[in-house]
């Protein structure tokens, strides 16, 4: 059976760095980003939320769960792609063929119990707010066509509140909490050693 590793934490916490570290231990896996499951801005729910990207209802949670469940059952999916510049889902999708290990990352992947129940190893990246904000600012301006003013406004109006309301409380579900994210060499070493040990004991880990 396919095993799923879930990596969560606030925006800019260093989830991608941890994924890269895992890739040194598990050479073959598919990566599912929850970001691709954002609803398009034109959806009814977004009008209700006033385009709040930091609320669980901003995601197509039913499709996200359906796809993870299919991957868990070793079935292929067609993952959506999200356009962050135009804030809508692209017309094309990506065919994802499951591998023995699937890594899923996103800010709210531990919020729903049905999704948590599909994840075999839950990792929470705990990084200071100021560091996360700086990383988010750099990313959104360089890769998502955002202005400095718009990123700051979003952070103050929804992102900060959304983190404390929805994301941070999910730490209690984590099997492993990594402070400082990808810069915590000792924690990443422990994680890598753990995965290597499991790999020696099982052909599919876990």
From Swiss-Prot:
Main location: cytoplasm
EC code(s) of this entry: 2.7.1.48
Protein family membership: Belongs to the uridine kinase family.
GO CC annotations on file: cytoplasm
Upper taxonomic lineage: Bacteria, Pseudomonadati, Spirochaetota, Spirochaetia, Spirochaetales
UniProt superkingdom: Bacteria
Pathway listed: Pyrimidine metabolism; CTP biosynthesis via salvage pathway; CTP from cytidine: step 1/3; Pyrimidine metabolism; UMP biosynthesis via salvage pathway; UMP from uridine: step 1/1
Class of this enzyme: transferase
GO terms, molecular function: ATP binding; cytidine kinase activity; uridine kinase activity
Catalytic activity entry: uridine + ATP = UMP + ADP + H(+); cytidine + ATP = CMP + ADP + H(+)
Keyword Ligase belongs to the record: no
Name of protein: Uridine kinase
Gene that this polypeptide is encoded by: udk
Coiled coil: none
One Pfam family it belongs to: PRK
Keywords: ATP-binding, Cytoplasm, Kinase, Nucleotide-binding, Transferase
NCBIfam families referenced in this protein's UniProt entry, alphabetically: PRK05480.1 (NF004018), udk (TIGR00235)
GO biological process terms held by the UniProt record: CTP salvage; UMP salvage
Organism: Borrelia turicatae (strain 91E135)
Intracellular or extracellular location(s): Cytoplasm
Positions that bind ATP: 9-16
Membrane spanning stretches: none
Keyword match Kinase: yes
Disulfide bonds: none
């Amino acid at each position: 059976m396919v095993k799923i590793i879930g990596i969560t934490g606030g925006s800019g916490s260093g989830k991608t760095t941890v994924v890269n570290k895992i890739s040194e231990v598990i050479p073959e896996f598919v990566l599912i980003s929850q970001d691709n499951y954002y609803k398009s801005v034109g959806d009814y729910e977004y009008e209700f939320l006033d385009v709040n990207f930091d609320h669980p209802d901003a995601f197509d949670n039913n499709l996200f769960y359906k796809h993870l469940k299919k991957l868990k059952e070793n079935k292929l999916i067609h993952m959506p792609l999200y356009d962050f510049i135009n804030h809508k889902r692209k017309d094309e999708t990506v065919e994802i063929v499951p591998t023995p290990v699937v890594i899923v990352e996103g800010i709210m992947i531990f919020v729903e119990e049905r999704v948590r129940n599909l994840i075999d190893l839950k990792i929470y990246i705990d990084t200071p707010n100021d560091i996360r904000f700086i990383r988010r600012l750099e990313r959104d301006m360089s890769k998502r066509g955002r202005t400095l003013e718009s990123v700051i406004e979003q952070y103050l109006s929804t992102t900060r509140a959304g983190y404390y309301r929805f994301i941070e409380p999910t730490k209690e579900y984590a099997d492993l909490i990594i402070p400082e994210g990808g810069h915590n060499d000792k924690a990443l070493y422990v994680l890598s050693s753990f995965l290597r040990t499991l790999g020696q004991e099982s052909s599919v880990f876990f």
